[in-house]
A protein has these predicted regions:
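Class II aminoacyl-tRNA synthetase catalytic cores and aaRS-like
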Residues: 1-257
């Protein structure tokens, strides 16, 4: 069946003008075995996909491919968890505690803005739509009236960022279709600085900061748009800030279903 990636096409030496494709995901053996009555099939297979190289993509990769008959979700998760535990112990000498943490899709999107959240650090999303619903600030007002939301993250300890660095974060979220970011800096003396201060009373700004447990030295970043745009933008932004602030360690593994 057609898949998202392109096949690697190899010219046939024996049949001029004909080609064969390297496997994107081996199917034939699996289908034959399952049709023959085998109750389960697990294969470690080399796969090839003609796609651009990215952090989570490469042309050649090794895939654990499995088909199990008469099982439910918990059976599948159990097989994979025991496999992960064994591999990480034997290869990296890392003890993985099972069962692994599970999180529903809606919770992952609401808290982290991603269906594959990095839970090694906080900086969770907070919905502040109710707090700002009566605002006359056009960006927030239009987003709410269109059925969207206003959400924010607290980049703890980033209040020292110069304006140029904050602007780079604004440009970053624009690649995820966000129109921009509003921001509030909590100064060391507890006072607040923001480019949207003229649209809100000091009490309302403080209410926003308090909702995110903001403290002196923190940077509150706010995005208003359709939910998908807000989730995509803030979900990617929290990971970008974590990378800049070195909030994650290479050997720290946090598995999540």
């Amino acid at each position: 069946t057609p898949e998202g990636a392109r096949d690697y096409l190899v010219p046939s030496r024996v049949h001029p003008g004909c080609f064969y494709a390297l496997p994107q995901s081996p199917q034939l053996y699996k289908q034959l075995l399952m049709c023959s009555g085998f109750d389960r099939y697990i294969q470690i297979a080399k796969c090839y996909r003609d796609e651009d190289l990215r952090a989570d993509r490469q042309p050649e990769f090794t895939q654990v491919d499995m088909e199990l008959s008469f099982v439910d979700v918990d059976d599948i998760l159990d097989v994979n968890e025991r496999l992960i535990k064994k591999v990480f112990k034997e290869i990296l000498d890392v003890d993985v505690q099972i069962p692994l943490q599970r999180m529903k899709y809606a919770e992952a999107m609401t808290r982290f803005g991603s269906d594959k959240p990095d839970v090694r650090f906080g900086m969770e999303l907070h919905d502040i739509t109710e707090i700002v619903k009566d605002t006359e600030f056009v960006v927030f007002k239009n987003a709410i009236e269109a059925g969207g939301s206003v959400r924010a993250i607290n980049a703890e300890g980033c209040g020292h960022y110069p304006r140029k660095q904050i602007d780079s974060l604004v440009e970053f979220v624009k690649t995820y279709k966000a129109k921009g970011l509003a921001w509030i800096v909590v100064n060391d003396d507890g006072s607040l600085k923001s480019q949207i201060a003229k649209f809100f009373t000091p009490e309302k700004l403080q209410e926003i900061v308090s909702a995110l447990d903001g403290k002196p030295g923190d940077l509150i970043l706010i995005c208003a748009d359709k939910d998908k745009v807000v989730f995509d933008s803030l979900g990617a932004l929290r990971c970008e800030i974590a990378k800049r602030q070195n909030l994650t360690k290479p050997g720290d593994f946090r598995f999540l279903w």
